[in-house]
UniProtKB/Swiss-Prot annotation:
This is Eukaryotic translation initiation factor 4 gamma 3. Interacts with EIF4A, EIF4E, eIF3 and PABPC1. Part of a complex with EIF4E. eIF4F is a multi-subunit complex, the composition of which varies with external and internal environmental conditions. It is composed of at least EIF4A, EIF4E and EIF4G1/EIF4G3. EIF4G1/EIF4G3 interacts through its C-terminus with the serine/threonine kinases MKNK1, and with MKNK2. Appears to act as a scaffold protein, holding these enzymes in place to phosphorylate eIF4E. It comes from Homo sapiens. The gene is EIF4G3. Residues 167-183 have a biased composition (Pro residues). The record marks 699-701 as: Cleavage. Component of the protein complex eIF4F, which is involved in the recognition of the mRNA cap, ATP-dependent unwinding of 5'-terminal secondary structure and recruitment of mRNA to the ribosome. Functional homolog of EIF4G1. GO terms for biological process: positive regulation of translation; regulation of translational initiation; spermatid development; translational initiation.
Length: 1585
């Protein structure tokens, strides 16, 4: 950067100062008593910097101090006020606005430069000697003192109701941690060390020792601590009057830093903090008074983080480090005293950093030269500062800084500074929350302000040095506190002159989010003193800002504009309490404070009006206007009530009153978010790692004018700690069973529990669950009349509410019909369920009169209503009541009918109901009548009752003819009449509830129907008119699809041709709809001859068939038998090009009415064609083929000539066209095979296709048609393919080719079929398992289309996994090794084989040698040992099937696996695992059996003898348990249902007379008698079907 001297002003360009606004100064760290600073106070993402200080003329022990830079990267410490305050006219201001820490997820970050990476600002730690904390004191009683009355105790005055004349509103303390009340310096007792320096202590920095903040982590609850008393009550913050006095001597006083929010530390650490604070002030004062500085300042700034791990820091100047860290045990005077002469614009001074740090509780310790007063007067002259490092400075440190003038374009683009070596030993960070620094003369104020003006550049240099310090700072700092404390205390007591410096900052420096981001610890340490100091500073700061705004007017830097925008976006409005601010850890809170990048944040500038009290007027009357006081509304100190504050209800509020601010839209780019996209206002205490969030992009360009404002946004505060109490209604509705009045009686509780169980059962009642639920009902205790009536009411209400389930509810009542209970009023008598139920039904049936009364009343109300809204409401209520009554009546009638069908009601009662309903001619009664007759008509309409029924129906017909009722009712009556005429067989199926089996069955039928319709539709689509096709004979045909129909060939099974075995054609050959060869679909010639004699007369259309040449090759060998494809082939029409192998039929009239063909010589109309064909039909005798008449022969002259050619080429045509036809026939074969699973039939059909070389089409169709179906379907298809290959009906080449067509598209198909690789493996596995094709051959062929897409390994792993389930890991590994295959050949290049196998769990394949367990000699295990091992695996270890397979194969050979010993041990272990003992009863856990079915199936292997051994083992296990009732029957049921044991094995066990197995056999047989009875009955039924 080129150095460019600034002649007009030594300060940075500043934006216009805007009116101050009330903010929440909560960023000051709370100084809390604690032991030594913890070793890790600062987070790893924050920098810690040390700044050297100037030598002071006072006897003050000097040492390096650490300062923590604030959130303001490149902008000076001032930000425009919110929109609700007036905006001054645009003009240059001495401060830059910038985003506050609340604008980012973390409290500190680095300046954003467009072309430079963002670095995080770091806490600058001012190491000083640390002295052991003094003895802790107990918590003191709260005393409230008035600083304007010399510290007079006014506690009693306030408690007694007298108003306090304190100029600041009460500043509440956070409620999270109880702390004693804070005190102002003028209020503290004599023995307490003063935090604000005395007159002589101009060096007292406006920042607190970092140690104080660090130490606060040690102890959560601070204790009162003596503080130094200021010799003068005026040692508060500088008053505005004094500030004005200094205006003439300072050019930019506003930059003076003093933490406005200074919580007076009541802890022992205050002493050290005060000591450190006394050291820091001279630096800021001295520096601020100098207009020009040399690069030595930069050097010292960069060297200010000695011995610490330095990190590159963004710097405004490019600084080259030329010195190395040196020994630290040297005196201060020997250390780097370098003259500094650099233009203030070029030197990034620490002033703003000081300002920031002071506000957040950290001060830079800078020593001022002795000539401070003189230098103050020379604003443009270069100044030589001698900076001394008090302790352990390096002998030689030299930084070469190339200053450059800071212009609007250059500020944002400074390069980061390289890491600088440590210059001094690390010290404990010092945080001084002092709000005012008193100096010996007004020039000190000027000095401090000047230093602040240089903050832009110096802070950037410092920010990097601090990054690596944090791990060391606390280690060596403890020992240096004592010296500094002593000197500071001495100085503070010496100072006799009450000169004060205004060290406050504009209130807008600290953004609302900055305050809200402070931790719970920071909020706790807020003092009332802090607010007073803020008030005293504001006026002075305003005057200094006005003065500075007159002298410096450079253009605004674009980066600053961006910052201004960011401030507006994120920091415009003060946020009362930031979510999670209290839950941030203490360490984070310290960092948050120390790292906020501007001291401006803590100063609160309040507009003192002429008529109101001012801090300079100590004796004046304290009165303020409303706006002034409202400025304090959302300060954290005002929001949170102190712990020990007395309950002054008139003054102190318990809760904050949130203002309702208008909502504004937040720019999503600026709104800070956490890593999970949580916005900042919902950040519940989470500290975002990594410092600040993403830098603000393109923000400055949206605010080009300083005065441009955005409307305030609404602050949404969410408290996660606050319990939200919902308002409870006094008379809230509760369910009857939960009301307290009923809960007292134990009998009532039992009754309600009974009703609850009945409701639960009723809700679950379905036809499928009926038996199971009825068992539960039978177990209920219904022993009183009240309970019985309650149960009946529940059942009845449920039945009439759900008429479709009335059958189930009626059956439930049938089961309960015998239930009797004693009557309540007559103890000797009983009442039964049936009587009460019928009474309930009758009461509901006769309820219509009561309903009519209700309806009449509502109708009168409706007629009397005058208002339209009232009429509408009443009308709706009336209609709703009628509808409800109608539905209840219909439900009741339906329920009554079902009860009658179950013989619970007599026939006479039903006739009475019918008569009653017929008498009432209202629509509701007639609808009920229809529903009743539909339900019970068939049962009432028997021979004896027919005359009565005739009367009913005659009356109904009369009602229909009279047409006095609505059409809906008339149609309902007519439907019932028609139903009786149809012998009560409904046209529609019953729409009641169905079982799962019924639903599945109907779904399967529906699916088949849909497939048939789709196939018909596809056939019709191929007949679209106007599409010309050229057949093999060269004929152009126009296919018309008008009115075309395809019929099921099963309806034409007996229609055959009387002569040759050729197809029937109703129109010329190329016409699309010609019939197939007979509707039989290709019967062989012999079959056709046999049928011809008996059925030839049926084929009346045989004369329409064109004459076939004698040389024509019959097509029967390749035709497909219709018997095999009735379900799927009936919908298939012929192809447009009229292949000679038709497979479908069509109506004759379809083609009589179809479009004319091009082979017709004349353009005769369709009517003429139809007429000629009908005349021909009439002439048929049915015995012989008749030649066409002369006209037709003439028309077909061309076709006749082409006929021989076609017949000669028939074989070639068949081959050329067979692929598409073969696809269709293959689909038919596969559909039928999957439906009936007849391998023999399917193989015969494939053989009849006679399409060697084209069977790859069959394979492809098989794969495609089963790919998305069930696993069993794919397994069956794989088995069929294996058998075809095994029988050599399907060649391996066709097999591979058929699969390859699918494999080429498999990767794309995986999008729609995610498990396609598993499905393909299921189709292939049977081939490998049975050895139809070798592993090597299949793997190589299948991988060819998959290698380009890198999926070969995936498919191969799925195949191997399936093989492991069916064979064993050992065998699969052997197969792989025998195939001599390498995984590298099947995986994408660069993929690690071992990792792939581990991921796919195929690592067992890698090992060439068997595992150790397999290598062991397989000794013969006894039955007991086998059982114990298997029991441990299955019951204790709960091993999965794979583990059991592995163990068995590792320990047993093939002979042992088939031995009865092993089979019995396995069956015993599985059955034992499945037995559940409930007290004295036993039952079977069918889930365990189902889980172990694969193991049983594998080793029993469907072998009857092995299954018999398993049954013997089961019998022995039951005998050991003393044969619990029904346990063996349950096992038999489960094993039979899961198809583990076959019927033959059960019968064999039943009839077995083996003497070794007779123990308990008789009892076992007796217990399963019902099972065998059911088994035989089921077998007989299947035979009958």
């Amino acid at each position: 950067m080129n150095s460019q001297p600034q002649t007009r002003s030594p300060f940075f360009q500043r934006p216009q100062i805007q009116p101050p606004r009330a903010t929440i100064p909560n960023s000051s760290p709370s100084i809390r008593p604690g032991a030594q600073t913890p070793t890790a106070v600062y987070q790893a993402n924050q920098h810690i910097m040390m700044v050297n200080h100037l030598p002071m003329p006072y006897p003050v022990p000097q040492g390096p101090q650490y300062c923590i830079p604030q959130y303001r990267h490149s902008g000076p410490p001032y930000v425009g006020p919110p929109q609700q305050y007036p905006v001054q006219p645009p003009g240059p201001g001495p401060f830059y606005p910038g985003p506050g820490p609340g604008d980012f997820p973390n409290a500190y970050g680095t300046p954003f430069y467009p072309s430079q990476p963002v670095y995080q600002s770091a806490p600058i730690i001012v190491p000083t000697q640390q002295q052991p904390p003094p003895a802790k004191r107990e918590k003191k009683t709260i005393r409230i003192r008035d600083p304007n009355q010399g510290g007079k105790d006014i506690t009693e005055e306030i408690m007694s109701g007298g108003g306090s004349r304190n100029p600041t509103p009460p500043i509440g303390r956070p409620t999270s941690t109880p702390t004693p009340p804070q005190q102002l310096p003028s209020q503290v007792p004599e023995h307490s060390p003063v935090v604000y320096g005395t007159v002589e202590s101009a060096h007292l920095a406006a920042s607190t020792p970092v140690t104080a903040a660090s130490d606060q982590k040690q102890e959560e609850k601070p204790k009162p601590d003596p503080v130094l008393k200021s010799p003068s009550p005026v040692l508060r913050l500088v008053l505005s009057g004094e500030k004005k006095e200094q205006e003439g001597q300072t050019s930019e006083t506003t930059a003076i830093v003093s933490i406005a929010e200074l919580p007076l530390p009541p802890s022992p650490t205050t002493v050290s903090s005060v000591a450190r604070s006394t050291i820091a002030a001279p630096t800021s004062s001295a520096l601020s008074s100098q207009p020009i500085f040399t690069t030595a300042i930069d050097d010292r700034c960069e060297l200010s983080s000695p011995r610490e791990d330095t990190i590159p820091i963004p710097s405004l100047t490019s600084c080259t480090e030329t010195s190395d860290p040196l020994p630290t045990n040297e005196n201060d005077d020997d250390i780097c005293k370098k003259p500094c002469s650099v233009a203030p614009n070029d030197i990034p001074l620490v002033s703003s950093t000081n300002l920031i740090n002071e506000i957040n509780g950290v001060s830079e310790k800078l020593s001022a030269t002795e000539s401070i007063v003189e230098i103050v007067k020379q604003e443009v002259l270069p100044l030589t500062l001698e900076l001394e490092i008090l302790e352990n400075p390096p002998e030689e440190m030299k930084l070469e800084c190339i200053p450059a003038p800071i212009t609007p374009s250059t500020v944002p683009s400074f390069p980061p500074t390289p890491p600088t070596p440590p210059a001094s030993p690390p010290h404990t960070p010092v945080i001084v929350p002092a709000a005012a620094t008193t100096v010996s003369s007004p020039s000190a104020a000027i000095t401090v302000q000047r230093v602040l003006e240089e903050d832009e550049s110096i802070r950037t240099c410092l920010s990097e040095d601090a990054k690596e310090i944090q791990n060391k700072i606390e280690v060596e700092a403890d020992g240096q506190t004592e010296e500094i404390l002593d000197s500071q205390n001495l100085n503070s007591r010496r100072s006799p002159v009450p000169a004060q410096i205004a060290i406050t900052v504009p209130k807008t420096w600290k953004k609302p989010k900055d305050r809200t981001r402070t931790t719970e610890e920071m909020l706790e340490a807020e003092l009332e003193l802090k607010a007073e100091e803020e008030l005293s500073i504001d006026k002075v700061l305003e005057s200094e800002q006005d003065k500075m705004s007159q002298g410096f007017h450079p253009e605004r830097d674009p980066s600053d504009l961006k910052k201004v925008k960011a401030v507006e976006e994120n920091g415009e409005e003060a946020e009362p309490v930031r979510n999670g601010a209290e839950s941030v850890s203490e360490g984070e809170g310290i960092d948050a404070n120390s790292g906020s990048t501007d001291s401006s944040g803590d100063g609160v500038t309040f507009p003192f009006k002429p008529e109101s009290w001012k801090p300079t007027d100590t004796e004046g009357k304290k009165q303020y206007d409303r706006e002034f006081l409202l400025d304090f509304q959302f300060m954290p100190a005002c929001i949170q009530k102190p712990e020990g504050l007395p309950p002054i209800s008139d003054v102190v509020l318990d809760k904050i009153n949130q203002p309702k601010l208008p909502m504004r839209t937040l720019d999503p780019r600026i709104l800070p978010r956490g890593p999970d996209f949580t916005p900042a206002f919902a950040d519940f205490g989470r500290q975002t790692p990594g410092g600040r969030g993403v830098p603000l992009l393109n923000v400055g360009s949206r605010r080009s004018q300083p005065g441009q404002r955005r409307e305030p946004r609404k602050i949404i505060t969410v408290s996660v700690k606050e319990d939200v109490h919902l308002k409870k209604a006094e008379n809230a509705w509760k369910p009857s069973q939960k009301r307290d009045s009923q809960a007292d009686d134990p009998e009532n509780i039992k009754t309600q529990e009974l009703f609850r169980k009945v409701r639960s059962i009723l809700n679950k009642l379905t036809p499928q669950m009926f038996n199971q639920l009825m068992k539960q009902v039978s177990g209920l205790t219904v022993d009183t009349e009240e309970r019985l009536k309650g149960v009946i009411d529940l059942v009845f209400e449920k039945a009439i509410d759900e008429p479709s389930f009335s059958v189930a509810y009626a059956n439930m009542c049938r089961c309960l019909v015998t239930l009797k209970v004693p009557m309540a009023d007559k103890p000797g008598n009983t009442v039964n369920f049936r009587k009460l139920l019928l009474n309930r039904c009758q009461k509901e049936f006769e309820k219509d009169k009561a309903d009519d009364d209700v309806f009449e009343k509502k109708q009168k109300e409706l007629e009397a209503a005058s208002a339209p809204e009232e009429r509408t409401r009443l009308h709706d209520e009336l209609e709703e009541a009628k509808d409800k009554a109608r539905r209840r009546s219909i439900g009741n009638i339906k329920f009554i009918g079902e009860l009658f069908k179950l013989k619970m009601l007599t026939e006479a009662i039903m006739h009475d109901c019918v008569v009653k309903l017929l008498k009432n001619h209202d629509e509701e009664s007639l609808e009920c009548l229809c529903r009743l007759l539909t339900t019970i008509g068939k049962d009432l309409d028997f021979e004896k009752a027919k005359p009565r029924m005739d009367q009913y129906f005659n009356q109904m017909e009369k009602i229909v003819k009279e047409r006095k009722t609505s059409s809906r009712i008339r149609f309902m009556l007519q439907d019932v009449i028609d139903l009786r005429l149809c012998n009560w067989v409904s046209r529609r199926a019953d729409q009641g509830p169905k079982t799962i089996e019924q639903i599945h069955k109907e779904a399967k039928i529906e699916e088949q129907e849909e497939q048939r319709k789709v196939q018909q539709l596809m056939t019709k689509e191929k007949r679209r008119p106007g599409v010309q096709r050229v057949d093999e004979g060269g004929w152009n045909t126009v296919q018309g699809a008008k009115n075309s129909r395809v019929l099921d060939p099963s309806k034409f099974l007996k229609i055959t041709k009387p002569t040759i075995d050729e197809k029937i054609q109703l129109v010329p050959k190329a016409q699309l709809g010609s019939w197939g060869k007979g509707s039989s679909g290709g019967a062989k010639a012999s079959e056709t001859d046999a049928l011809r004699s008996s059925a030839s007369s049926l084929n009346r259309f045989s004369a329409l068939q064109p004459p076939a040449p004698s040389g024509s090759t019959p097509s029967t060998p390749v035709e497909f038998d219709s018997r095999r494809t009735l379900t799927s082939r009936g919908s298939m029409g012929r192809e447009k090009n009229d292949k000679p192998l038709p497979s479908a039929t069509a109506r004759p009239n379809t083609f009589m009415r179809g479009g004319s063909s091009k082979d017709l010589l004349d353009n005769q109309s369709q009517e003429e064609q139809r007429r000629e064909m009908l005349e021909t039909v009439k002439q048929l005798t049915g015995g012989v083929d008749v030649e066409r008449n002369s006209t037709e022969a003439e028309r077909n002259k061309t076709r006749e000539s082409a006929k021989p050619e076609i017949s000669a080429m028939s074989a070639h045509d068949k081959a050329a066209l067979s692929e598409e036809e073969l696809e269709r026939k293959s689909k038919s074969i596969i559909d039928e095979f999957l439906h009936i699973n007849d391998f023999k039939e399917a193989m015969q059909c494939v053989e009849e296709l006679n399409a060697q070389g084209l069977l790859h089409v069959f394979v492809r169709v098989g794969v495609e048609s089963t790919l998305e179906r069930s696993q069993i379907t794919r397994d069956h298809m794989g088995q069929l393919l294996y058998q075809l290959v095994q029988s050599e009906k399907l060649s391996k080449q066709d097999f591979f080719k058929g699969f390859s067509e699918t494999l080429e598209l498999a990767d794309d198909m995986a999008i729609d079929i995610p498990h396609i690789w598993l499905y393909l493996a299921e189709l292939v596995t049977p081939m490998l398992k049975e050895g139809g094709i070798s592993m090597r051959e299949l793997t190589i062929e299948f991988s060819k289309p998959l290698l380009p897409v890198g999926r070969a390994g995936v498919l191969l792993s799925e195949i191997l996994h399936l093989l492991c389930k069916q064979m064993s890991h050992k065998k699969v590994g052997a197969l792989w090794r025998e195939a001599d295959l390498s995984w590298k050949d099947f995986l994408p290049e660069g993929e690690d084989v071992h990792n792939f196998l581990l991921e796919q769990k195929l690592d067992f394949i890698e090992s060439d040698s068997p595992c150790s367990s397999e290598a062991l000699s397989k000794k013969e295990l006894s039955a007991e040992e086998l059982y114990k091992r298997l029991e441990k695996l299955i019951i204790e270890d709960k091993a999965n099937d794979e583990q059991i397979f592995d163990w068995v194969e590792a320990n047993l050979d093939e002979i042992q696996m088939s031995s009865p010993t092993f089979l019995r041990a396995l069956m015993t272990a599985v059955c034992k695992a499945a037995i559940i003992a409930d007290s004295s009863t036993f039952r079977v856990d069918t889930a365990v059996i189902k889980q172990r079915v694969p193991i049983l199936l594998k080793y029993l292997d469907s072998d009857t003898e092995k299954e018999l051994q398993a049954l013997y083992a089961l019998q022995a296990s039951i005998v050991k348990l003393d044969q619990p009732a029904n346990l063996l029957r349950m096992f038999f049921d489960c094993l039979y249902d899961e198809e583990v044991i076959s019927e033959d094995a059960f019968y064999k066990w039943e009839s077995s007379k083996d003497p070794a197995e007779q123990n308990g056999k008789g009892v076992a047989l007796k217990s399963v008698t019902a099972f065998f009875t059911w088994l035989r009955e089921a077998e007989e039924e299947s035979e009958d079907n």
